[in-house]
Amino acid sequence: HNNAYERLLTVLDMEDIFEENLKLDFIQGRVNYLRKYTHKFYSSSKKQYLYALTLFTLFVENVSLFSQFYVINWFARYKNVLKDTDQQVKYTRNEENIHALVGIKIINTIRDEMPELFDEELEERIRGEAMEAFKSEAKIVDWMINGIKEPGLDADTVKEFIKNRINSSLEQIGFKPVFEVDNELLEATMWFEEELLGNNMTDFFHSRPVEYSKKSQSFDEDDLF
């Protein structure tokens, strides 16, 4: 995935954008919360492992990239643009989901074998981290959406989508959810879950192998969006 996205930045002549974005406070805020799983909070190695695994599974694998996945997939689905990028995002999206499911399975196995590790203090710490994660992700969404208001693509809808992913992640490991979710807004995002979890059928008449265009090819902004 890394090579594909690096290639995409090269095609768009945006090689420096990653380093530039890291200078933004809200981007650095995301980096900081995603690195919390490396911080030591518990003297018990078993509990520290569980804490780190839970943060990594829930937030790195199952939340942090999904607002971006949603936006790219939305443009491909409803505007018929960014098709090559959309295909790469789908590969990444599906693999991140698998990674998260594996992590959740491991966490639940630990719960079965060592239930004493799952005390009230751990749950409240994880739920608190979930709220901090959402605050960081919400700032990313506002920056990324930048005032767009389309059916299924506006800041409020994408934020509800993220809240729901966080709630679902917590519930899958036996913790209480932290957010009230607007089901009416969430309804507009169900296509994403259907694509992610359902069995997709290939349209052999229109689906074809694609490659990123060479950097030498010129692009018009209207062609991309």
Label for each model-derived stretch:
Residues H1-F225:
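Non-heme di-metal
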